[in-house]
Swiss-Prot record:
Keyword DNA repair in annotation: no
Pfam (any one): Herpes_UL87
Protein name: Late gene expression regulator BcRF1
GO biological processes: viral transcription
Any GO MF annotation of the entry: DNA binding
Region (Disordered): 153-174, 186-228
Length: 575
């Protein structure tokens, strides 16, 4: 009865196939399953869509890419490879694609980007694993037809003629001669196509069958393509940031009932056309609506809605208006302004975003530095926090990449990849910006782990399991009066305070994103504990490697702190 347990059952890595078509379907299913496991990202969606479209229309290329040996490089001239590789490094887990010059160190699983200007090509080496091999094939499929395996081009038309269709050539065969005669009609003059009213239609750009079929098979854009509450933007090698939409300003018009207009809506005299007649603040859903006069007072009302959230929240807000306004109909709405905010997590010397910069100006009524490029203003605050208005979507992402890349790649910039990965992960999990209390606690954990020579990557693993998750609606983190009113609290600005030297100090007095060095630089007049100086010396050793200016700044700060604390220590010793 136990004899069958002595036999070892071996399961083959691939199931037995009955034909070539079944094998191609299995490979395409494996690639599709791998692509569907990717996170939600605009660039990853582009890679997934282009690869699936090319492989669906040309299934004979699946075998060519799948059976290519790891030592055979893929060659391409498409500039989209840089963008695809950067997105994969920043978004896909356990993926690190190395970039080097082609020919220096030939390796396995590489894609060589050839320069169109005759320069030296660049090589991108994928990880030596099944996942890296699969990712290389998918990236190559998304770059078709500008890809070749070794010296063999993968043009779809050429591969199609080699895969199953016979190449039509003129010869002694009567069938070939007939096909050649019929093909001559393609070059003959023809009448222009007629338009919808019988008039000749003007000449347009020629469209291939592949483009038309791709347009027909393209999936419809998602409903949230024009609005994203948070957007992940990869900037530079391995640096990520999350941009959050704080609020939007939406303009529209209302049609009100005639008998109740004078009584409930516009019971004030009209001064000018854009005069605010009435202003309402609603707590749930939280929004502010302002009523304006129009020419047809009593029939139409122009409203201005300031709201944060999705379009579903906006529809709920418009429904809430019917509770206190005699609304009969609402005209189509238009978004007039977008406001977004972001934090540069992992930038140790945060003063770099405001110092020694050209093309910026200071505002007098608000302590911020405004950088103006392409007609768009980005306001930078003290703790590497920025706000940007008027743009959203892909335009916002491209403008932020142009704005932040010079800061991240500056020769004096000191970037902590561990902090950037940790704080970005928490913001991505909780869909809100990390709060002051959480950031200080986690930054202290990371610095103490580095001081005690422990592995700080374990904190990232714990955070990925949800141990450090937070809620933006908790009382100690919220400054929104609507949320505090919903929770039954009296004060709207109930931010956590600390008692230092018999004085209350707010945690966010230097900004939500203020790190250890920023607090040391602006709060040196307070009495500090001995562990404070120990951590500061350790940070000087850690950040001073190759950064003379940062080390010099911390050394001056240490000398200033010793001078401040010296009389206190002497007095304590006498007592």
């Amino acid at each position: 009865m136990l004899a069958h347990l002595n036999q070892v059952t071996r399961i083959p890595p691939c199931p037995p196939f009955s034909g070539r078509e079944a094998r191609l379907k299995f490979h395409f299913f494996s690639w599709s399953t791998f692509m569907l496991s990717w996170p939600n990202n605009a660039t990853l969606r582009e890679i997934r869509t282009r690869a699936a479209t090319n492989l669906t229309h040309h299934p004979h290329l699946v075998d060519t890419l799948y059976h290519a040996s790891p030592q055979t490089p893929f060659l391409t001239r498409s500039g989209a490879l840089y963008r695809f590789v950067t997105c994969c490094n920043c978004t896909l887990p356990n993926i690190s694609i190395q970039q080097c010059k082609a020919g220096d160190r030939p390796g396995d699983l590489e894609i060589i980007l050839q320069s169109n200007g005759g320069g030296r090509p660049a090589s991108f080496q994928f990880p030596s694993s099944p996942t890296g091999s699969l990712l290389r094939c998918i990236v190559a499929a998304s770059l078709l037809p500008e890809v070749s395996v070794g010296h063999q081009e993968l043009s779809p038309l050429r591969s199609r003629s080699q895969g199953g269709q016979t190449d039509v050539r003129s010869g002694p065969d009567p069938a070939r001669r007939l096909v050649a005669l019929l093909r001559r009609e393609d070059g003959a003059p023809k009448d222009p196509p007629l338009g919808p009213f019988g008039h000749p239609r003007g000449p347009g750009p020629a469209k291939s069958e592949d483009e038309e079929s791709e347009r027909r098979d393209a999936p419809p854009p998602p409903l949230d393509s024009s609005f994203q509450a948070s957007r992940l933007v990869p900037v530079g090698p391995g640096f990520r940031l999350l941009v959050f939409n704080t609020n939007r300003v939406i303009n529209t018009k209302l049609v009100c009932s005639e008998p109740l207009v004078k009584m409930r809506v516009c019971n004030v005299p009209r001064l000018i056309n854009n005069f605010v007649a009435r202003k309402y603040v609603v707590k749930e859903t939280a929004f502010t609506v302002s009523l304006f006069f129009t020419d047809g007072v009593g029939a139409n009302l122009a409203i201005n809605v300031n709201i944060s959230g999705t379009y579903l929240s906006f529809l709920l807000a418009m429904t809430s208006l019917r509770c206190f306004l005699p609304v009969e109909a609402i005209y189509p709405a238009a978004v007039s302004n977008w406001n977004s905010t972001l934090d540069l997590h992992g930038l140790e010397n945060q003063s770099l975003v405001r110092e020694n910069r050209s093309g910026v100006f200071w505002t007098t009524n608000f302590p911020s530095v405004v950088s103006c490029r392409d007609g768009l203003n980005v306001s930078w605050f003290k703790a590497a926090t920025a706000t940007i208005s008027r743009v959203h979507g892909q335009t916002l992402e491209q403008h932020l990449i142009r704005e932040i890349t010079p800061i991240v790649t500056h020769r004096e910039a000191k970037i902590s990849r561990i902090k950037n990965r940790l704080f970005t992960l928490l913001e991505l999990r909780n869909r809100s910006q990390i709060q002051v209390l959480h950031k200080r606690f986690l930054e202290g954990l990371l610095d103490c782990a580095s001081l005690l020579r422990l592995d700080p990557s374990c904190i990232n693993r714990i955070a990925s399991e949800g141990l450090f998750d937070f809620s933006k609606r908790s009382i100690a983190h919220s400054k929104n009066r609507h949320e505090c009113a919903l929770l039954g609290h009296r004060h709207s600005a109930n931010v956590t305070k600390l008692v230092v030297n018999e004085r209350k100090t707010r945690l966010d007095i230097l900004g939500r994103n203020a790190n250890f060095l920023t607090r040391c630089k602006h709060q040196v007049n307070l009495r500090q504990s001995p562990i404070f100086l120990t951590l500061l010396r350790h940070i000087r050793r850690r950040l001073g490697l190759g950064r003379a200016s940062v080390k010099r700044e911390i050394t001056l700060l240490l000398a200033h702190l010793r001078k401040k604390t010296a009389p206190i220590h002497c007095r304590d010793a006498q007592v």
